[in-house]
């Protein structure tokens, strides 16, 4: 049996726009992982950061509560070493609100940031082609 997905729906004189919760979750994940001090998403099944984010990993690391025209977000992250948990948490909240409201036009009611651990090794840098 497939899981029921929620949609954010907006309607105007031209018709309607339906945005899947998977799309919102992907926006949240991208915004959170771009914040300085975030090592990656916390993937509870493996208890590790993931550099390549799959839909399964997003669904375990980002939870949405859709209520009418606004949403509540919970995001589970790992902190990089030598960063302030409070500062990173606030930066993640700001980044998520901005990204979701700009990209999807949806009001974000709240962003709960769960810092599930600290990674002591350096974050791998993407390979640069020459």
Task: Please provide the spans of the model-predicted regions.
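Amphipathic, hydrophobic secondary-structure cores in small proteins
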Residues: 88, 98-102
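Contiguous, often N-terminal, cationic amphipathic patches that form binding interfaces
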Residues: 1-85, 90, 106-112, 116-118, ...
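A short beta-strand micro-motif common to beta-rich folds, especially ectodomain repeats
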Residues: 92-96
């Amino acid at each position: 049996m497939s899981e029921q997905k929620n949609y954010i729906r907006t309607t105007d004189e031209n018709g309607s726009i339906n945005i899947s919760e998977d799309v919102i979750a992907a926006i949240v994940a991208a915004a959170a992982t771009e914040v300085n001090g975030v090592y990656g998403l916390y993937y509870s099944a493996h208890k590790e950061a993931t550099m390549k984010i799959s839909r399964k990993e997003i669904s375990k690391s980002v939870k949405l509560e859709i209520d009418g025209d606004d949403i509540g977000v919970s995001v589970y992250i790992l902190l990089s070493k030598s960063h302030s948990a409070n500062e990173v948490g606030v930066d993640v909240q700001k980044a998520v609100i901005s990204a979701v409201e700009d990209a999807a036009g949806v009001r974000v009611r709240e962003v709960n940031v769960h810092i599930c651990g600290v990674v002591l090794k350096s974050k791998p840098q993407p390979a640069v082609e020459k």
